[in-house]
Amino acid sequence: MADEGKSYSEHDDERVNFPQRKKKGRGPFRWKYGEGNRRSGRGGSGIRSSRLEEDDGDVAMSDAQDGPRVRYNPYTTRPNRRGDTWHDRDRIHVTVRRDRAPPERGGAGTSQDGTSKNWFKITIPYGRKYDKAWLLSMIQSKCSVPFTPIEFHYENTRAQFFVEDASTASALKAVNYKILDRENRRISIIINSSAPPHTILNELKPEQVEQLKLIMSKRYDGSQQALDLKGLRSDPDLVAQNIDVVLNRRSCMAATLRIIEENIPELLSLNLSNNRLYRLDDMSSIVQKAPNLKILNLSGNELKSERELDKIKGLKLEELWLDGNSLCDTFRDQSTYISAIRERFPKLLRLDGHELPPPIAFDVEAPTTLPPCKGSYFGTENLKSLVLHFLQQYYAIYDSGDRQGLLDAYHDGACCSLSIPFIPQNPARSSLAEYFKDSRNVKKLKDPTLRFRLLKHTRLNVVAFLNELPKTQHDVNSFVVDISAQTSTLLCFSVNGVFKEVDGKSRDSLRAFTRTFIAVPASNSGLCIVNDELFVRNASSEEIQRAFAMPAPTPSSSPVPTLSPEQQEMLQAFSTQSGMNLEWSQKCLQDNNWDYTRSAQAFTHLKAKGEIPEVAFMK
């Protein structure tokens, strides 16, 4: 900070960094320098200054008294800081690497029953890019023993958590490189022995949480919906009761945010100044716990990079205070500083008390209504008749329970593929699990060998693959058909609709599908499929409500077994002349008491008005 020379002379002559080890009968500052020196592994008094990169942070004795401080102004010229060195200020620093177990204790902690526990830190390099739920479920699915991750968090690009026994750590070690991510890269898992995690050592007791809640209530202004937690650790009531609340500790920040969520989720303003915060990882959940927050004061802390703000950029802040953090020194001028902060908080109106120009908003707040989906598109009546006839035959066989009859529908060199949406959670627990192993979602699948293997070649392999898929019943009334390309030797069309599974674990589950066929003319004046792409997803609530509103008839090789020979002959003739299938032709004849002339007149009248559904022509 620009004013660092002054703050050093006023406060830092008493500064001491120390690990937060709780001992009975000792206050938080009664710690032996010699003991810490041995544990740090660096003898002598000339110990190198270093940030304690742990949850309890770099804690100064001066925190107990809120002395004067020169306010940092990012809009003025910054003096050179290089003249201020640690040895000029008579400060004593101790570095403790807590994830390295001290020789005399190993990675052991002590359980409540007095037995010894070995703790291990699990590190996943580049784990920050993975969703927590997906990552843990994938590790659990490959791990031979169940485990409970303690203190899962992200540290820079890494994901980390702790486990409390050697057998679990050994099982997790065996998972190393066994998991493929969505880009088909193997995930590394590193195991190190460790001291007990801070949430175990520094967990606030229930009675301490209640006291913290009481103190926060005293600091809350209901009329402004504002909570002032400035210099919380040095609060006189907390100090008097020997409750050490350090917001750099994950457990303390979690307890604070939980109190906010449970008691004042409508919070508009939060002051966290002068709490020596050097990272905001543990604050990320504030986006959900206080979604209405508009004003946030982080001044007088120790944030080094504006990237820390990425962890809370989901907040719709209008006012932010950052002065007094070293991150302000990293910008060459005022406009760069404002741009970097506004990139995270585009609705920001005030920064460090300065009014900002109104934000340029490109987002449209007003709700937009999507145009309604149109019906099928066939181009010509001849193509319509050809495609609907093909689909009627195809899905009658597909839903029959034996799909071997589809062999005649495919070309000898046909190919087929299936894809489903990417499943971030454990695929084995997804309702689409039966489709997952065959999914060729090229947006996520990068391995060319696997891409090729999941593409089914030749009609025998295609039909064998289709036979392995769950048995289905399609709602033909839901079909929307679009012809997208047509030449004299090729036809490309897609079908959208819904179906339900009729057996297995997902019986009666409703799915939506899109299927794209590329076909060539067949010898029987029909179509022969050369390419078949099937996309399956879970049906939406609207699709579920509309599905099977008119029950589709069960496919049968003899659709009119109860008719007399004369009626069957009339039915065949009417179906041929009208172009309708047997089911709808029979309905038309029955509605007109099997009077052929009246039925023909009714058909002509209804067709002219466009009141006959397309499904009536699917044969």
From Swiss-Prot:
Domain NTF2 per the UniProt entry, residue ranges: 386-536
CDD domains with a match to the protein in the record: NTF2, UBA_TAP-C
Annotated motif Nuclear export signal, positions: 83-110
LRR repeats by residue range: 266-291, 292-315, 316-343, 344-371
Modified residues (Phosphoserine): S9
Biased composition (Basic residues): 20-29
Modified residues (Omega-N-methylarginine): R42
RRM domain ranges (all copies): 119-198
One Pfam assignment: Tap-RNA_bind
Keywords associated with the record: Acetylation, Cytoplasm, Host-virus interaction, Leucine-rich repeat, Methylation, mRNA transport, Nitration, Nuclear pore complex, Nucleus, Phosphoprotein, Protein transport, Repeat, RNA-binding, Translocation, Transport
Segments of this protein annotated with the region Interaction with ALYREF/THOC4 and LUZP4: 2-198
Subcellular location: Nucleus; Nucleus, Nucleoplasm; Nucleus speckle; Nucleus, Nuclear pore complex
Region called Major non-specific RNA-binding, residue ranges: 61-118
Minor non-specific RNA-binding: region residues: 2-60
GO annotation, cellular component aspect: cytoplasm; cytoplasmic stress granule; cytosol; nuclear inclusion body; nuclear pore; nuclear RNA export factor complex; nuclear speck; nucleoplasm
Superkingdom to which the source organism belongs: Eukaryota
Domain TAP-C: 565-619
Function: Involved in the nuclear export of mRNA species bearing retroviral constitutive transport elements (CTE) and in the export of mRNA from the nucleus to the cytoplasm (TAP/NFX1 pathway). The NXF1-NXT1 heterodimer is involved in the export of HSP70 mRNA in conjunction with ALYREF/THOC4 and THOC5 components of the TREX complex. ALYREF/THOC4-bound mRNA is thought to be transferred to the NXF1-NXT1 heterodimer for export.
Protein name: Nuclear RNA export factor 1
Organism: Homo sapiens (Human)
Gene name tied to this protein: NXF1
